[in-house]
Amino acid sequence: MIYYLLVPLVAHFSALNVFRYITFRSIAALLTALVLSIVFGPKFIDWLRRLKFGQYIHEDVAAHKQKAGTPTMGGLLIAFCIVVSVLLWGDLANEYVWMTLFVFLGFGALGYVDDHAKVVRKQNKGLTPKQKLLGQIVVSGVAAALLVLDPEYSTRLAVPFFKHLTPDLGLWYLPFAMLVMIGASNAVNLTDGLDGLAIGPMIVNAAMFGLFIYVAGHAQMARYLQVMPVSGVGEVTVFCGALVGAGLGFLWFNAYPAQIFMGDVGSLSLGGALGFLAVLCKQELLLIVVGGLYVAETVSVILQVGYFKMTGGKRIFRMAPLHHHFELMGVPESKIIIRFWILSILLALVGLSTLKLR
């Protein structure tokens, strides 16, 4: 909105030319989302308390019982701040911006239904796994189809550290892109079990993929760094900036001890958006590295369930996802969170190194 109001005036006021730059508008979106989060956060938390939208806690983790009743569905605050910031600072004529918002809000709507069902039923169960998966398939399928049907969008796959290895998946790219989005969404959802555990790495991941998206959308940079170019995708950097800002603002209240939880409306939407960002900048496989924390949490659940079924009741971990295993080992929650954040930053640096190590 601001973009369209001020850019036409550049001919009269040259200083306004700064609003043409994606980098400036991305920083502006970050600051806008951050301020909105911090300003509206307390009022939003009070509103959730009045509605009695409290979190129902996993009974198997005794230390979590004190968190019962903490306001949930904080993802609505994140969504509000991101959408407002993108609408203010983004180029709304860019199709990739709208596609990203569609995925973000689509997965968020699914999470909202799930959260609302939990609140109404007064238990820690919402949608069934099949219902949730069906919704994810629909949202990711529409987004992936729009990309595959775009003649200017490549269905080639970039392999980290190998600049000349770019296999073309053709129509198989559609289910692959869907898998990336659904997998990322569920992975973030599984990770969201401790105060600030999911949002911290999300901020790091959003910043990292914001950089890759900016490079992919800049023809000269993409050529120099040998990254697959995607014309027009650079504008989505504004969304990434807004996500980082909203994430920082939410962390202000979600840090241990949390005053609010993001709920499924937050974890599913952020995870789905993260997967789509990786797809947009042609760095789908890099998400496994940069989002390694989310991958580890998901793999721990898969291994636990599989081993439990194969052995008739035996377990690899004391509890899955992985963060609960460390909790039951006696590691303080705050220490688990900080250590996982550190690992996330290190993994992001490994991902960043792929820009030159090819």
UniProtKB/Swiss-Prot annotation:
GO CC list: plasma membrane
Pathway listed: Cell wall biogenesis; peptidoglycan biosynthesis
Residues annotated as transmembrane: 27-47, 73-93, 97-117, 133-153, 165-185, 196-216, 233-253, 260-280, 285-305, 335-355
Enzyme Commission number(s) from the entry: 2.7.8.13
UniProt entry tagged with the keyword Cell cycle: yes
Cofactor requirement: Mg(2+)
Record-level GO BP terms: cell division; cell wall organization; peptidoglycan biosynthetic process; regulation of cell shape
Record-linked InterPro entries: Glycosyl_transferase_4 (IPR000715), PNAcMuramoyl-5peptid_Trfase (IPR003524), PNAcMuramoyl-5peptid_Trfase_CS (IPR018480)
Pfam families in the cross-refs: Glycos_transf_4, MraY_sig1
Enzyme class, first EC level, given as a word: transferase
Reactions the enzyme catalyzes: UDP-N-acetyl-alpha-D-muramoyl-L-alanyl-gamma-D-glutamyl-meso-2,6-diaminopimeloyl-D-alanyl-D-alanine + di-trans,octa-cis-undecaprenyl phosphate = di-trans,octa-cis-undecaprenyl diphospho-N-acetyl-alpha-D-muramoyl-L-alanyl-D-glutamyl-meso-2,6-diaminopimeloyl-D-alanyl-D-alanine + UMP
Subcellular location: Cell inner membrane
Molecular function terms from GO: metal ion binding; phospho-N-acetylmuramoyl-pentapeptide-transferase activity; UDP-N-acetylmuramoyl-L-alanyl-D-glutamyl-meso-2,6-diaminopimelyl-D-alanyl-D-alanine:undecaprenyl-phosphate transferase activity
Coiled coil location: none
Keyword line: Cell cycle, Cell division, Cell inner membrane, Cell membrane, Cell shape, Cell wall biogenesis/degradation, Magnesium, Membrane, Metal-binding, Peptidoglycan synthesis, Transferase, Transmembrane, Transmembrane helix
Membrane topology: Multi-pass membrane protein
Biological role stated in the UniProt entry: Catalyzes the initial step of the lipid cycle reactions in the biosynthesis of the cell wall peptidoglycan: transfers peptidoglycan precursor phospho-MurNAc-pentapeptide from UDP-MurNAc-pentapeptide onto the lipid carrier undecaprenyl phosphate, yielding undecaprenyl-pyrophosphoryl-MurNAc-pentapeptide, known as lipid I.
Family: Belongs to the glycosyltransferase 4 family. MraY subfamily.
Protein known as: Phospho-N-acetylmuramoyl-pentapeptide-transferase
Organism: Solidesulfovibrio magneticus (strain ATCC 700980 / DSM 13731 / RS-1) (Desulfovibrio magneticus)
Source organism phylogeny: Bacteria, Pseudomonadati, Thermodesulfobacteriota, Desulfovibrionia, Desulfovibrionales
